[in-house]
Amino acid sequence: MFFDTIAAISTPLGTGGVSVIRVSGNNSITEINKIFKGKNLIKAKTHTITHGFILNKDQTILDEVLISVFKTPNSFTGENVVEINAHGGILITQMVLERILSLDIRLAFPGEFSQRAYLNGKMDLIQAESIMDLIHATNENAIKIANSGLQKYTSQLVTSLRDQILNLIAQIEVNIDYPEYDDIPQITQQKIALEVQSLIKQLENILSHSHKNRYLKEGIKTLIIGRPNVGKSSLLNAFLNENKAIVSDISGTTRDFVEAYFNCRGFTLHLIDTAGIRKTDDPIEKIGILRTEKMLLQAELILLVLDQSNYLQEEDIQLLQLTQNYPRIIIGNKVDLKSDKLISSLCDYSSQLTPQEIISVSSLDKTGFFELQQTILKKFQLNDIKPKDFNYFSNARHINQIQIALRSFQDLQQALLQSMPIDIYSIDLTKAYQALGQIIGENQENSLIKELFSKFCLGK
């Protein structure tokens, strides 16, 4: 329970038609009523709008407003909430806020409204974090994932798993505490092993879908790599339909990263055009090449660009070897020049690399770009997304807790194989139960809660 009343501007600060100032706290209606000229807000019914005026200290009119009243417990925060719709000028909005703060009301911290909603039981931690995800969504799929969290689909996943674990713990504890009762179902190691295996499969399925959702939400970090002058920058520009990167016949034009985002049928490619890798004496170009090599370790996808109009060069072969253990797609650029030099030399280079593995494209006329996008979608299993696929996690914190729970079950499997005493099994089950509970905010440390909500906007 909170005893102070808070206020903040909820709309972006700028010139517009309307700005909204949100006030929350058990005394919010009483306090705002002191500076309001119009019908008595204390007598207003919940979820109603009242027209009137905000008054200055000298009782002159500051602004004409519409005030929405939401009474506890049926409000966003669970407290009495007042939302003041003022005119949308920067100065007038600030003046209305200052007038509100002259009362027994303080400025809210970032995310404090959502934090109060969580602490007052109006939402769980997944829903609170989904609000942030919705605000910061950069593509349509990210919005769908966030809405799934708000509708508690992911919370229900956690609740179902925890119910199964709790039931198993209860069976074990009853058998330990009351072994003499014949009417209690006997729990055997075989039965525990079957239950644990089922839970592991469920967690692995959740993780598989959640990793996919992370790509849908955050995008795929995609490194465009190749020797100089194979058309890496042209490829980036073709993706974006604009001249983002400098294109030149002079080798080594790109010396640092050029980053851009491309919406590929609902999900985001975080494209990074890199310095061409080759032997060079240019100190600045050397730095760019070293940074490119380091970026390989961080990339989720590598687009290795080769020149289809030319035979394989020594640098091409080095890059093929360097990236063979990374997630990559090999692109044969400049297909518009209608040359098969690259294909013929590939056959000589390696029997393991076939022409079918090369996606032939033209950055000039965009030939092959549809096939390239399809290949990327298939590689990350994003080519057949169904509505139910959004009902999984995408937040790194949630995925980490799922992994902790999974490791606890894997430890339990080892204990079962060693036929350890039955009371030992409850330890790993409890660890998994607690790890999943932290996803929805159960038994969370105050420091973590504060950190999570501090990332929210002011007024949210």
Swiss-Prot record:
Top-level lineage group: Bacteria
Magnesium found in the keyword field: yes
A GO term, aspect molecular function: GTPase activity
Cross-referenced PROSITE patterns: G_TRME
Binding site for K(+): 229, 248, 250, 253
Residues annotated as domain TrmE-type G: 219-381
GO BP term, example: tRNA methylation
Purpose of the protein: Exhibits a very high intrinsic GTPase hydrolysis rate. Involved in the addition of a carboxymethylaminomethyl (cmnm) group at the wobble position (U34) of certain tRNAs, forming tRNA-cmnm(5)s(2)U34.
Subunit text: Homodimer. Heterotetramer of two MnmE and two MnmG subunits.
UniProt protein name: tRNA modification GTPase MnmE
Organism: Aster yellows witches'-broom phytoplasma (strain AYWB)
GN (gene name): mnmE
